[in-house]
A protein has these predicted regions:
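Serine-esterase "nucleophile elbow" of acetyl-processing enzymes
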Residues: 1-12, 16, 20-30
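Alpha-helical cap/lid subdomain in secreted, periplasmic
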Residues: 20-165
Length: 165
């Protein structure tokens, strides 16, 4: 089954920090659909205030995009949910960063923006490798299928995700 899309990956694996230059570049792309995963890379570098500024700039800038749909995926479940070290940045920031993304999508107020919860893509911890942060090979496959379901409207999360109005 295919959605009939020509996909171009502009992912910045392990290094995306919602930089202004990246936001400006993505806003200029001639695409029908954008999908973004925001969160985990910034957890160890930034506090909530800086994360909020970066996410706001990214999403406000993407309002200039010609994309008809912009799917914003918040942080995937990871070791931050089960960390015993409550001083760990992953533990402290997991929930607050997800909330920042959610609130910012709503604040943007553009019907093209769709919030997809990370747990709709990474549905359980068996998708992760032993570091409980990065997907395993099988996890990548399952996450890809779940993402395709979300983007094409076949996933149950599409009905449950919050749409900015």
């Amino acid at each position: 089954m295919t959605a009939g899309w020509d996909v171009m990956n502009k992912g910045l694996s392990g290094s995306c920090l919602c930089e202004r230059e990246v936001a400006d570049y993505l806003a200029e792309l001639s695409v029908d659909v954008l999908s973004l995963v925001i969160g985990v890379n910034m957890v160890i570098f930034f506090d909530e205030e800086e994360t909020c500024k970066r996410v706001e700039y990214l999403l406000e800038t993407l309002k200039k995009s010609r994309a008809r749909d912009i799917f914003v995926i918040d942080m995937f479940p990871n070791k931050g949910l089960i960390a015993l070290d409550q001083d760990s940045a992953y533990y402290r920031h997991y929930r607050s960063f997800k909330e920042i993304v959610r609130q910012t999508v709503l604040k943007v107020g553009d019907h093209r923006f769709h919030l997809v919860k990370g747990e709709e893509i990474l549905k359980n911890f068996t998708y992760l490798s032993t570091d409980l942060l990065h997907p395993s090979d099988n996890g990548h496959i399952r996450m890809g299928a779940n993402l395709a379901d979300q983007l094409t409207g076949r996933g149950k999360g599409v009905l449950q995700h919050e749409r900015a109005i």
